[in-house]
């Protein structure tokens, strides 16, 4: 590693951790309707939205009504995007006259962007019109991120409130999350990216002749606006097929740094938002400590693995520093590894190199980051409510060990809450192991694997893990654009999204109705090093014990077979 690599890592953490506490407080004030510095500008717009849609911002909802509103909104978004993708050849802003998507691919794409997964079985510049990218995908990037933020806020209210049946108003939370939480940051980042060289235009693709005399089509489009929200909203779906490895998506070192930091900026800020809701920022610091510990363990492992020479090229005539296959030379090994670990620690899925080219241990780190439920920062809202589920599981285990009724911040965890927690523990195994086993056992779907042996199994395992974790990244050698995989991966995305959201809202409703008992000396503290250790071990054990056999068949077997 060179000095540049160390400065990149330091700058990355600085850009994320310095503004995060202030942004977290801002989100708390926004979501609770308190006045902020943006209120004079956006307040009239917010009130106009309520008047036009007939929403009473003072009318709160029970968890059941909140859930129904969320499901109805997401269904409407799916149907609209599905229609746009099917009939894009009849719609405007299609200068390349691209045809509509085949229906299983359109289903997969619509589910992918509605669930904040952004799995892409297509190449954007070769398959989608400007309208589909802008009015279809970009809109869903905003509202899917806002949905996750709204669910987190509902859970925070459930934990922080007492003896109430309401969790807020879904329509109000969605409006505030989009208007205040996402749009201003995206505007700033989009303008910055345009300055750095990312295109934002409706012009036709450019026909050019290369220095070798070969004709080439250079794709353009309204890319900067979509890239801003794909990073900040932990969406990850690229405007271009190779995502942020494309020079039009990630043209400079500065663009690379801020796009990378944008992946986890809001998820880290929302950790502090939770602390404001429960009036105890010590809880936020403990949770963030756990997230950082898991992130640093994975990052260090991945960096070490990627700087090892490839033993299959163990030849004195071959000089090796670090394997560069699948990496952009302008970003280098450290820049690619840092992005790989960050994009899978958050449910982002964007890449600036090829995940399929990672060494086996680095690929395993990416898999484990997703298998633990995308709780190491995770998606906007989704990562934090996933982490809070693990916090409650850790509290329950601590209660069993010391022989007391488990409680968290004065709320007792009883049979109903534990049952809901168990339901969430089954989401990833069902999505990854059940759906993945079906795909692996059938000769047709298994034909999507491009490599024999352990790496081929890793390709399939990665695809179904990514879909179920709502991540969206992929091992590029996996040919996913088949009717079977389009439908099965779409099902995995739905399970991974709503298999968490529905129990989380039910849990929030149950906790909101409980009284808060005073926290005494005999209560198990959830803000110290002991609890951080317990929480970290809980996350690793739940994920590790469930998926260790599949990891042994994939990346671990590949690592050993290569002779590392």
From Swiss-Prot:
Task: Report the protein's function.
Answer: Part of the high-affinity ATP-driven potassium transport (or Kdp) system, which catalyzes the hydrolysis of ATP coupled with the electrogenic transport of potassium into the cytoplasm. This subunit binds the periplasmic potassium ions and delivers the ions to the membrane domain of KdpB through an intramembrane tunnel.
Give one GO molecular function term: P-type potassium transmembrane transporter activity
Signal sequence region? none
The record lists the membrane-crossing segments as: 4-24, 67-87, 135-155, 179-199, 254-274, 286-306, 382-402, 420-440, 487-507, 528-548
Gene Ontology CC annotations of this record: plasma membrane
Give me the gene this protein comes from.
kdpA
What is said about its interaction partners and assembly? The system is composed of three essential subunits: KdpA, KdpB and KdpC.
Would you say which domain of life the source belongs to?
Bacteria
- List keywords of the entry alphabetically: Cell inner membrane, Cell membrane, Ion transport, Membrane, Potassium, Potassium transport, Transmembrane, Transmembrane helix, Transport
Q: Name one Pfam family in it.
A: KdpA
**What is the protein named?**
Potassium-transporting ATPase potassium-binding subunit
Membrane topology value: Multi-pass membrane protein
Q: Which organism is it from?
A: Pseudomonas fluorescens (strain SBW25)
The similarity annotation says: Belongs to the KdpA family.
Q: What is its main location?
A: membrane
Instruction: Establish whether keyword Chloroplast is in the entry.
Output: no
- Name where it's found: Cell inner membrane
């Amino acid at each position: 590693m060179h000095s540049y690599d160390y400065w990149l890592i330091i700058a990355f953490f600085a850009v994320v951790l310095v503004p995060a506490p202030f942004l977290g407080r801002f989100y708390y004030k926004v979501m609770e309707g308190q006045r902020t510095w943006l209120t004079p500008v956006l307040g009239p717009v917010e009130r106009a939205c309520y008047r036009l849609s007939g929403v009473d911002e003072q009318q709160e909802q029970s968890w059941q009504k909140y859930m129904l509103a969320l499901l109805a909104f997401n269904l409407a978004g799916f149907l609209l995007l599905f229609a746009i993708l099917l009939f894009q050849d009849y719609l405007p802003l299609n200068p390349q006259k691209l045809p509509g998507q085949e229906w299983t691919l359109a289903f997969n794409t619509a589910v992918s962007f509605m669930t904040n997964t952004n799995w892409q079985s297509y190449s954007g510049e070769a398959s989608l019109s400007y309208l589909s990218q802008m009015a279809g995908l970009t809109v869903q990037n905003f509202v899917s991120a806002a949905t996750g933020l709204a669910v987190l806020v509902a859970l925070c209210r459930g934990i922080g409130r007492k003896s109430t049946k309401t969790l807020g108003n879904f329509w109000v939370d969605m409006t505030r999350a989009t208007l205040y939480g996402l749009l201003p940051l995206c505007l700033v980042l989009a303008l910055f990216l345009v300055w750095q060289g990312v295109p934002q235009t409706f012009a036709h693709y450019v026909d050019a002749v290369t220095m070798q005399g070969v004709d080439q089509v250079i794709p353009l489009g309204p890319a900067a606006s979509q890239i801003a929200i794909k990073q900040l909203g932990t969406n990850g779906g690229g405007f271009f097929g190779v995502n942020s490895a494309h020079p039009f998506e990630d043209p400079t070192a500065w663009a690379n740094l801020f796009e990378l930091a944008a992946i986890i900026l809001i998820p880290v800020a929302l950790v502090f938002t939770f602390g404001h809701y429960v009036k105890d920022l010590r809880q936020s610091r403990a949770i963030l400590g756990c997230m950082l510990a898991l992130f640093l363990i994975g990052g260090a492992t991945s960096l070490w693995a990627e700087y090892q020479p490839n033993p299959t090229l163990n030849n004195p005539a071959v000089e090796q520093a670090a394997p560069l296959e699948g990496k952009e030379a302008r970003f280098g090994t450290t820049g690619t590894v840092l992005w790989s670990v960050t994009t899978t620690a958050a449910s982002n899925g964007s890449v600036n190199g090829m995940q399929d080219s990672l060494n086996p241990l680095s690929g395993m780190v990416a898999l484990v980051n997703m298998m633990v439920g995308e709780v190491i920062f995770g998606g906007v809202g989704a990562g934090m409510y996933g982490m809070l589920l693990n916090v409650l599981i850790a509290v329950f285990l601590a209660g069993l060990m010391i022989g007391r009724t488990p409680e968290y911040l004065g709320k007792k965890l009883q049979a109903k809450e534990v049952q809901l927690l168990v339901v969430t523990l089954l989401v990833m195994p069902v999505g990854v192991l059940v759906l993945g086993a079906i795909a692996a056992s059938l000769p047709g779907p298994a034909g999507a694997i491009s490599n024999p042996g352990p790496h081929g199994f890793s390709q399939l395992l990665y695809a179904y893990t990514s879909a179920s974790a709502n991540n969206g990244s992929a091992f590029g050698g996996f040919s996913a654009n088949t009717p079977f995989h389009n439908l099965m991966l779409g099902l995995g995305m739905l399970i991974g999204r709503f298999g968490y959201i529905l129990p989380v809202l039910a849990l929030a409703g149950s906790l909101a109705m409980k009284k808060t008992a005073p926290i005494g000396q005999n209560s198990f503290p959830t803000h110290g090093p002991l609890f951080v250790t317990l929480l970290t071990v809980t996350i690793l054990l739940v994920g590790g014990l469930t998926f260790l056999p599949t990891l042994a068949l994939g990346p671990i077997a590949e690592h050993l077979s290569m002779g590392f």
